[in-house]
Swiss-Prot record:
InterPro entries for the chain: Ade_phspho_trans (IPR005764), Adenine_PRTase (IPR050120), PRibTrfase_dom (IPR000836), PRTase-like (IPR029057)
This protein's pathway: Purine metabolism; AMP biosynthesis via salvage pathway; AMP from adenine: step 1/1
Keyword Transferase attached: yes
Gene Ontology MF term list: adenine phosphoribosyltransferase activity
Catalytic activity: AMP + diphosphate = 5-phospho-alpha-D-ribose 1-diphosphate + adenine
HAMAP family: Aden_phosphoribosyltr
Species assigned in the record: Haemophilus ducreyi (strain 35000HP / ATCC 700724)
Major location category of this protein: cytoplasm
Protein name: Adenine phosphoribosyltransferase
Location of the protein in the cell: Cytoplasm
GO biological process: one example: AMP salvage
Statement: the UniProt record of this protein carries the keyword Transferase: yes
Length: 179
């Protein structure tokens, strides 16, 4: 079995969770398999090694699980993007629309430098809303976001196209049909 097949087969699909009609892609089963977890980190690192990335940003909260080891393997700083009131220093905020309502993300004002070339890492690409908001934060601080990496992609939900429209190339290890 190749590494990507190992990764995909390690992700359990849970029908009708969290609501009827949704198939939840559960990364906890991937995390419970150290060989598959390491393969996912190694594949992202291999894609972005020697590409001029200066910082890795992870989005709350599952982006932390994959982003921190990617940053460590690349020898780069890791920056957190969090929900409101979770970061202790001065922050910049960005609100974004959800299916029903709105959410907000924050990052420290001093975490991105002018002209940083940032890789954003998250567990899953669905609609791209979280990464769009994250990119706005980074760009407001003078950083560049040209790439985002995901373990899972759900192409039917349009996230890849949304990110392309804002100048971000998405890299996904495995894809699943549907929601």
């Amino acid at each position: 079995m190749n590494q990507l097949d190992l990764i995909k087969s390690s992700i359990k699909s849970i029908p009708n969770y969290p609501k009827v009609g949704i198939i939840f892609r559960d990364i906890t089963s991937l995390l419970e398999n150290p060989t598959a977890f390491k393969a996912s980190i190694d594949a992202i690192v291999a894609e972005f090694k020697n590409k001029g990335i200066t910082k890795v940003v992870g989005t709350e909260s599952r982006g932390f699980i994959f982003g921190a080891p990617v940053a460590l393997a690349l020898g780069l700083p890791f920056v957190l993007v969090r929900k409101p009131h979770k970061l202790p220093r001065a922050v910049i905020s960005q609100s974004y629309a959800l299916e029903y309502g709105e959410d907000t993300l924050e990052m420290h004002l001093d975490s991105i430098n002018q002209d940083d070339n940032v890789l954003v890492v998250d567990d899953l690409l669905a609609t791209g809303g979280t990464i769009d908001a994250t990119a706005k934060l980074i760009r407001q601080l003078g950083g560049q976001v040209k790439n985002a990496a995901f373990v899972i992609g759900l192409p039917d939900l349009g996230g890849k196209a949304r990110l392309e429209q804002i100048g971000i190339k998405s890299f996904t290890l495995v894809e699943f049909d549907g929601h």
